[in-house]
UniProtKB/Swiss-Prot annotation:
Binds 2 [4Fe-4S] clusters. It holds the Pfam family Fer4. [4Fe-4S] cluster 1 binds at residues 8, 11, 14, 53. [4Fe-4S] cluster 2 binds at residues 18, 37, 40, 49. It comes from Chlorobium limicola. One of its GO terms (molecular function) is 4 iron, 4 sulfur cluster binding. Its cofactor is [4Fe-4S] cluster. Residues 2-27, 28-61 form the 4Fe-4S ferredoxin-type domain. This is Ferredoxin-2. Ferredoxins are iron-sulfur proteins that transfer electrons in a wide variety of metabolic reactions.
Amino acid sequence: AHRITEECTYCAACEPECPVNAISAGDEIYIVDESVCTDCEGYYDEPACVAVCPVDCIIKV
C-alpha cells in the first residue's frame, strides 16, 4: 500500500487516477485507504498516484 505524506499540496491529481478508489480528500491532505490500495498491481506497471504526484509525496508503506 501507499501513503500520502504531509507534503501533499491538495492538488487532487492523484484521486481520479486510482483504479480501486482508495484515495479520498482529507481535511488538509489526500488520504490513501491502505486496506483498499493494491499498489496498482494488475492495473499499471507503477502506482498511478505516484506517477502523477507533482511533489512526490506518496510513499510505499
